[in-house]
């Protein structure tokens, strides 16, 4: 994982009102996590956060550079990113979903399995979606039993969980 790799925290879903506020689709913990960042990369420009509040299915935000509804609408679909190095440090046993995506997976017996294609959470904990070399996917719960170890280079999956 590289410190400069961009991490997408939200996407602009459209305008909210007439004063340049935007609706955001969030990819993280919630609107409050965006407050930790003052500037976001938005394609070929930077946006400075003025305010953000929770809203139905996401958040509503105001940025210094967006003055009216037309400017807000023009940014629909824009991804808001920060460098990986700007994220808070992790404690033992913690991980960011984007750090796992793309990592190769091996079984506890050492055999290659595939790679992490996605990390989902449907409310009961994180689930790794692993894609095999043949393109077929299977899911594994992100628990010590199913995934005994992982690091920045590889994810080890208990052989009993491999389909």
Swiss-Prot record:
An accessory protein needed during the final step in the assembly of 30S ribosomal subunit, possibly for assembly of the head region. Essential for efficient processing of 16S rRNA. May be needed both before and after RbfA during the maturation of 16S rRNA. It has affinity for free ribosomal 30S subunits but not for 70S ribosomes. The gene is rimM. Coiled coil: none annotated. This is Ribosome maturation factor RimM. It is found in: Cytoplasm. GO terms for biological process: ribosomal small subunit biogenesis; rRNA processing. Keywords: Chaperone, Cytoplasm, Ribosome biogenesis, rRNA processing. Belongs to the RimM family. It holds the Pfam family PRC_RimM. NCBIfam families: 16S_RimM. Residues 92-161 form the PRC barrel domain. Binds ribosomal protein uS19. GO terms for molecular function: ribosome binding. Signal peptide: none annotated. One of its GO terms (cellular component) is cytoplasm. It comes from the Bacteria. HAMAP family: Ribosome_mat_RimM. InterPro entries: PRC_barrel-like_sf, PRC_RimM, RimM, RimM_N, RimM_N_sf, Transl_B-barrel_sf. The PRC barrel domain binds ribosomal protein uS19.
């Amino acid at each position: 994982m590289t410190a400069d790799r961009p991490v997408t925290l939200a996407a602009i879903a459209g305008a909210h009102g007439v004063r340049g506020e935007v609706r955001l689709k969030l990819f993280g913990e919630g609107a409050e996590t965006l407050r930790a960042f003052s500037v976001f990369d938005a394609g070929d420009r930077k946006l400075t956060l003025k305010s953000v509040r929770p809203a139905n299915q996401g958040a509503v935000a105001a940025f210094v550079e967006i003055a009216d509804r037309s400017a807000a609408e023009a940014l629909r679909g824009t991804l808001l990113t920060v460098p990986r190095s700007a994220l808070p440090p992790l404690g033992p046993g913690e991980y960011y979903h984007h750090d796992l995506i793309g990592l190769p997976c091996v079984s506890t017996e050492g055999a290659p399995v595939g790679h992490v294609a996605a990390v989902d959470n449907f409310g009961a904990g994180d689930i790794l979606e692993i894609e095999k070399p043949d393109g077929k996917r299977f899911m594994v719960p992100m628990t010590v039993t199913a995934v005994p170890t992982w690091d920045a280079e590889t994810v080890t999956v208990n052989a009993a969980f491999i389909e």
